[in-house]
Amino acid sequence: MTKIQKTIDFQVHFNATIFSTILRKRRFSAEKKGDFTMSVDVTKMPKLGFGMMRLPEKDGELDLEQICKMVDAYLASGMNYFDTAYMYCGGKSESIVKKALVERHPRESFTLTTKLPQWMMDEGIEGRDRIFNDQLARTGAGYFDYYLLHSVEDGANYDGYVKYDCFNWARKKKEEGLIKHFGFSFHGTPELLDKILSEHPEVEIVQIQMNYADWDNPLIQSGRLYEVLRKYNMPFLVMEPV
């Protein structure tokens, strides 16, 4: 196994996103959120995503040459899902996505997810728009295949997303063609997850932490979260799979 292959193997196992295959399509009635169809076709997703959170460094900076090789090898394997966020790698992850992926591969050849951090929206609603515009500029992607509210959890975090009307705002971004699918990554309780999914049928996908070790963990409660997702027939992504 080459050095690059070993690095990719480490990256996939410790910073990957694994996908469930629960649902093909959902339709909501006009009485709820209007007559619209949400179609997250998980059958088209790869089994492993490429997480852009923990990336190799050289001399204190992200190692672009190494990252490009990893991205190329991942795409060559037939997989195409990349996950980043505004704050990853000290705020440099989205920019490295532009250099290693967006500028080097056709836009239609990959799927890109990024996330909105409520705790960095210092200006409130204006901060929400500033961050989103920064993300478009940083990545150069033109649009995001998946856009997630980042690390939703009980308390002030979720209250902030509600206060700044992020759910309706994201739907408008979808109508503008800047987001294809909308959801959130989640670190809260099963009760909060149930509340959000019951109140926001516009949500198309959820990302949770799930693995065998955390299935009955009283802090993470992977098993109970999974049951809530099944209740709503909700497609989901898995972080921290091993």
Map each language-model feature to its residues.
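N-terminal binding-site loop/beta-alpha segment at the start of enzyme catalytic domains
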Residues: 8, 17-110, 169, 175
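Structural motif corresponding to the early beta-alpha repeats
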Residues: 104-129, 150-153
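Short, acidic/polar
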Residues: 61-74, 124-138, 188-197
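Active-site groove signature of glycoside hydrolases
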Residues: 139-157
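Generic structural signal for well-ordered alpha-helices
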Residues: 71, 94, 98, 129-136, ...
